[in-house]
Amino acid sequence: MTPAPFYAEVADGPEGGAAHWLTTSDGLRIRAGHWTGGTKGTILLFPGRTEYVEKYGRAATEFLTRGYSVLAVDWRGQGIADRMLNDRAAGHVHHFPDYQKDVSAVLAHARALGLPEPYHLIGHSMGGCIGLRALYEGLPVKSAMFSAPMWGIIIAPALRPFAWMSSWTARRVGQGHRLAPGTEPVTYVMSTPFDDNTLTTDRAMFDYMKAQLSAHPELALGGPSLHWLNEALMEMRRLAARPSPATPAITFLGSNERIVEPSRIHDRMADYPNGKLVMLDGAEHEVMMETPAIRTRVFNETTAWFDAHS
């Protein structure tokens, strides 16, 4: 195993956190970070777009306190994993199913580290899209938690055909690397005042995210490329056409969600035979980084779900 940088001072997580470089089957270098000591099992934590291992340091403390070790990942194209374009600010992936190669590398790493089983999945936002695909492909977890999963993206109905057409056209005329309309190269938390943000109502957690990127700007990522947008739209459509997997899953959704499409989540969970949807009154997109009361509820109900399905 090759050690990778791990920024413990900004993660603010449990003692002993560490990171390693992983090589995917297509030769890319991604990063995985872990916090060990929980003996009930291990959480495979799939972050959202723009995110990185250290963002979940405080969440790891909560999970470790409740008995679970945590393994998180910098997906290809973000964090300090290999970026996919010369323009490091643009979020990009060649093909959305490529993220499953990262999943395979993370799973092999969990086994190489000897992390305690059973495994459970947490998928936040884009990680919820990747995680749902991984469940269909046989990810060996006993249960899952989805946090505001990206099973749809909020796009005004009048603009939805334009999003499909512009993203499809851009990639076919060699312009797929350009940022999607309405996005910018500066990462969201660095360009948006707290009072205008759509991530959390908790100022302390917003400042925590901002401080991480101020200290380590190499972790930052701007808006998605048009190519990424087209790939994401196609993947979400493919997933929506499939029945829910058998893996038991609890899903958390804030009542103020303004990034992913709530109707897609309601539709999925209404027809999920081993699923439960928990609505969080007043919460925005980042339910694990919300107010203390909301965070505590999420961590308690998540680990109770894992306990019941181990």
Describe these PLM feature segments.
Residues K276, D281-S310:
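Catalytic active-site module of serine/aspartate enzymes centered on a nucleophile-bearing elbow/loop
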Residues P245, T251-L253:
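Short beta-strand/loop motif that positions the catalytic acidic residue
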Residues T247, E261-A270:
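Short alpha-helix in the alpha/beta-hydrolase fold that links the catalytic acid
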Residues V53, A60-N86:
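Conserved alpha/beta-hydrolase
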Residues N256-V260:
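Acidic catalytic loop of the alpha/beta-hydrolase fold
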Residues G91-R111:
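Alpha/beta-hydrolase active-site loop
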Residues M126, G131-H216:
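Alpha/beta-hydrolase-fold enzymes
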Residues M1-T23, L28-W35:
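An N-terminal hydrophobic leader/cap segment in hydrolases
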